[in-house]
């Protein structure tokens, strides 16, 4: 069976190596602005929060939206109740650093850089791009890396959404002081989704952390089920970008 995650990680190593040749870590550190508005400043535990994702393509389903640009999606989300935006910078999702920069220039909401972090370099790169938060996927990092990258992220003035998919991932995340834990309903090997993944993992989660259900949310009923189960918010991409009325769908999922 095709392992999409393994393919992405293998290619990511080459992408990061090329980025380092173009702009060294020392160069990035010299350009970083120390001021940063963190994810946690607007994304609060106890409230219902929608992270709306600017995603044009999926490795499993191909093109998801051919009508809107990433910045157009970002404006729709910001105007209709999203607490935060997730912007892909990985080419498998038609994402790029240039897209992130464009959104950062036009949007005031905090931004999550959505990518596959395998090297500390990417954390500094995210800060240079203007990210308020990064995604750390427990599945592709060792326990030591996960903890180290979390502290590096904080030292740069950003927050981290630590992503888990099963009990082993959850155990690794809970062994760190991570504030935000995202339960990915998408199996990163097959890219199939089900919100049952979140419902099954919630009993193993620390309810003192801010818990986000990621992917597979398509209706207000899905969102309400997750909220009632104990989630503090959702991260939604396909469920927004493929909607007939993206603005109306954003409002529905943001106002649960």
Where are these regions (language model features)?
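Conserved, mostly hydrophobic/aromatic
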Residues: 8, 52, 77, 126, ...
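Active-site beta-loop-alpha junctions enriched in small/polar residues
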Residues: 11, 55-57, 90, 116, ...
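Catalytic cores of alpha/beta
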Residues: 118-130, 166-176, 213, 217-236, ...
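Glycine-rich phosphate-binding active-site loops on the catalytic face of alpha/beta enzymes
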Residues: 128-145, 182-190, 231-249
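An N-cap/entry alpha-helix motif that binds or orients negatively charged groups
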Residues: 2-65
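C-terminal helical cap(s) of enzyme catalytic domains, especially alpha/beta-barrels
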Residues: 200-204, 227, 242-256
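Catalytic-face loop-and-helix region of soluble metabolic enzyme cores
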Residues: 180-222, 227-234
């Amino acid at each position: 069976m095709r392992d999409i995650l393994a393919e992405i990680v293998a290619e990511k190593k080459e992408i990061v190596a090329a980025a380092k040749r173009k702009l060294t870590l020392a160069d990035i550190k010299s350009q970083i602005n120390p001021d940063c508005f963190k994810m946690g400043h607007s994304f609060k535990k106890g409230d219902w929060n929608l992270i709306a994702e600017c995603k044009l393509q999926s490795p499993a389903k191909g093109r998801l939206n051919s009508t809107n640009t990433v910045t157009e999606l970002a404006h729709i989300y910001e105007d209709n109740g999203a607490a935060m935006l997730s912007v892909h910078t990985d080419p498998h999702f038609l994402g790029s650093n240039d897209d992130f920069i464009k959104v950062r220039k036009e949007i005031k909401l905090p931004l999550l850089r959505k990518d596959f972090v395998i090297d500390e370099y990417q954390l500094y790169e995210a800060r240079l791009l203007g990210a308020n938060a990064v995604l750390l996927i427990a599945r592709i990092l060792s326990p030591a890396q996960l903890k180290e990258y979390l502290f590096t992220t904080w030292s740069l003035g950003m927050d981290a959404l630590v992503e888990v998919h099963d009990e082993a991932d959850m155990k690794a995340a809970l062994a760190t002081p991570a504030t935000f834990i995202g339960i990915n309903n998408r199996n990163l090997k097959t890219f199939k989704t089900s919100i049952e993944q979140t419902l099954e993992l919630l009993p193993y989660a620390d309810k003192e952390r801010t818990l986000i259900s990621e992917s597979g949310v398509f209706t207000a009923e899905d969102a309400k089920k997750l909220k009632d189960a104990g989630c503090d918010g959702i991260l939604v991409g396909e469920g927004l970008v493929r909607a007939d009325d993206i603005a109306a769908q954003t409002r529905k999922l943001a106002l649960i």
